[in-house]
């Protein structure tokens, strides 16, 4: 309760109070209240300042603690770095010492090997040359054995052709007349392939030393002789090719025999056949007919074996139609396999010989749009080819 000086009347008449004294008391009360409120606000401001200062101090304390922790980590990392640098220096020194020791040992070993290198290189070079010559001899022997096997297979199936064939070429007629009865007909037959393969040695027309007319005349003359030779070839007494309507076809009576010949030659020369062959199993009766595709398979397989054996190389100037015509003369290819030697080059199976079977088949269909009935082309009874097999 505020203590204010009262008038005498109010002092005597307690607890009553007059209006003037009441005003004084109220004035004093509001005045005191304002002072208290100002004091409270100032104190609140001080408290707020103290709070902000305490927050800043707390942040500084936290930052100080973090810095202290980082300093401790930095000191620990510095100590670790010093220890690692010491270890690295020691390891570096050990490696340098090891390298110096190894260099010394290498120098000593190189000095020792210097005296032996010359003799060792001579020894290995001699061994390499010896092995290379031995491999060449073995390769030549292998080709000789393969050639003997090819000859025996073709002789076993009684391959024959016109032995007294005289070529219409310069030099061959004179040679046959000079040698008389001692003349070897195999050399004449093999020269057919030689004369055409000789054209493949040149890279351009200028290398052939022939004009276009002379080259065309040579091709026509050569193909006429190939046709004459092909028409005279027989297997087991049966013509390999027969003519029908001025076109040459593979004799179906020889299909089974030629299939066995292809299999034997591919086995003895280690040449994979590009086309499958159809053979009867032992418990089946002999096949009475072959399909047109089987006949094409046989023709293509024989040309494939001849080409991969190095018997014949197609010239660069030959056209596609001429190549297709030449590949159909199966008798000619059999004669080349019988008369010409094998080459020593290893064939590349991934290299195409100029015409794959798909192109060969398409050209055949274009030449004969109507499939031919091979049963109508038989030269004699179908039981004839199976006599030798049985």
From Swiss-Prot:
Q: What is its main location?
A: cytoplasm
Q: Where in the cell is it found?
A: Cytoplasm; Preautophagosomal structure membrane; Vacuole membrane
> What's the protein's topology in the membrane?
Peripheral membrane protein
- What's any one GO cellular component for it? fungal-type vacuole membrane
Where in this chain does the entry annotate a coiled-coil region?
Answer: 31-83
Offer one example of a GO biological process linked to this entry. Answer: autophagosome assembly
Fill in the subunit field for this protein.
Component of the autophagy-specific vps34 PI3-kinase complex I composed of vps15, atg6, pik3/vps34, atg14 and atg38.
According to its UniProt entry, what is the function of this protein?
Answer: Functions as a part of the autophagy-specific VPS34 PI3-kinase complex I that plays a role in autophagosome assembly. This complex is essential to recruit the atg8-phosphatidylinositol conjugate and the atg12-atg5 conjugate to the pre-autophagosomal structure.
What is the name of this protein? Autophagy-related protein 14
Question: Which species is the source of this protein?
Answer: Schizosaccharomyces pombe (strain 972 / ATCC 24843) (Fission yeast)
